[in-house]
Amino acid sequence: KDTNLEPKIKTSYLLIGLNKIFPKLEGDYVTFIGSTFVTYGKEETYLNHCICLGDTENIEKESQVIECYENEKDVLLAWTRLIQKEDPDIIIGYNIFGFDYPFMYDRAKENQCVTEFMKFSRTKTEKKSDLDNTNIILASGEYELKYPPMEGRLQIDVFTYMRKEFILPSYKLDYVSSYLILDKVKSF
């Protein structure tokens, strides 16, 4: 008799029992997705766009758009439509490979809309429903990076770049921003 299986079996029965009593555990929601679009060579953005879960006040500026949706699935799919519509060549973010993409992907799985959500590629026939991943090894350790396949678009994670190219006491966004602009970043 294999005694190593006993704790696993007991845990399985416990989980089955708890699932009958308690509702299924849900994760955190995607409450908003903010995107800024700029044309290469221009200093001004042409669109500041925010997709929100639930209602919020609108901003009366032509280049700023707020879209509100009643459920998280619609929030996620609205961002996919935005990427398809604006058709960016380059997508830049901070820790998007370590947090944003994996988080949104997990939420799309929870909302059963992964196939629709993952339509970011410029190749209309490309249908992938998993994140691509790769590992990088830095002095501080090995890191797994996860990102959606977006054929025809360059994706840059500034967080990964900063950890690789700069030795800083902190890689929090406010510290890195202050370091790069040589001034203290003010929070509002």
Language-model segments: residues:
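Metal-dependent nucleotidyl/phosphoryl-transfer cores and adjacent nucleic-acid-binding surfaces
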Residues: 1-188
